[in-house]
Amino acid sequence: MSVAQNYGTGRRKSSTARVFIKPGSGNISINGRTIEDFFGRETLRMIVRQPLVVAESEDRFDIAITVKGGGISGQAGAIRHGLTRALMDYDETLRPALRKAGYVTRDARKVERKKVGLRKARKRPQYSKR
């Protein structure tokens, strides 16, 4: 007798988030902690809530999130992506609004690897002409 829930997977940088939404009162649980405990910065909490604001459903769902890998910024982006996918799974008519806001597209930017002979990914050693 499981209650109907919708699922979405989100990724950003090296973070992966699994997001489950079900009708409720607006509780957000991330790895068993509240959103306030998990994200200290208000900007990160705002990033997580953005798809709910666009869908005008801040207090309509209880959200359970498991997130792994990366840092806090990447995790917030992964949660936003996963929440967007879960909302689209719940109601496909939300897709155009979420797409217009830019939340549907996976941000494919990753850290570029360091190359041999260079100091960083692109920074070269100083060149001496003479």
Curated annotation (Swiss-Prot):
Keyword Ribonucleoprotein part of the UniProt annotation: yes
GO molecular function, one term: RNA binding
Superkingdom classification of source: Bacteria
Matches recorded under InterPro entries: Ribosomal_Su5_D2-typ_SF (IPR020568), Ribosomal_uS9 (IPR000754), Ribosomal_uS9_bac/plastid (IPR023035), Ribosomal_uS9_CS (IPR020574), Ribsml_uS5_D2-typ_fold_subgr (IPR014721)
Biological process terms in GO annotation: translation
Entry keyword Ribonucleoprotein: yes
PROSITE patterns attached to this UniProt entry: RIBOSOMAL_S9
Keywords: Ribonucleoprotein, Ribosomal protein
Annotated GO CC locations: cytosolic small ribosomal subunit
Family designation: Belongs to the universal ribosomal protein uS9 family.
HAMAP family registered for this protein in UniProt: Ribosomal_uS9_B (MF_00532_B)
Family matches, as PANTHER family: RIBOSOMAL PROTEIN S9, SMALL RIBOSOMAL SUBUNIT PROTEIN US9M
Protein name as annotated: Small ribosomal subunit protein uS9
Originating species: Marinobacter nauticus (strain ATCC 700491 / DSM 11845 / VT8) (Marinobacter aquaeolei)
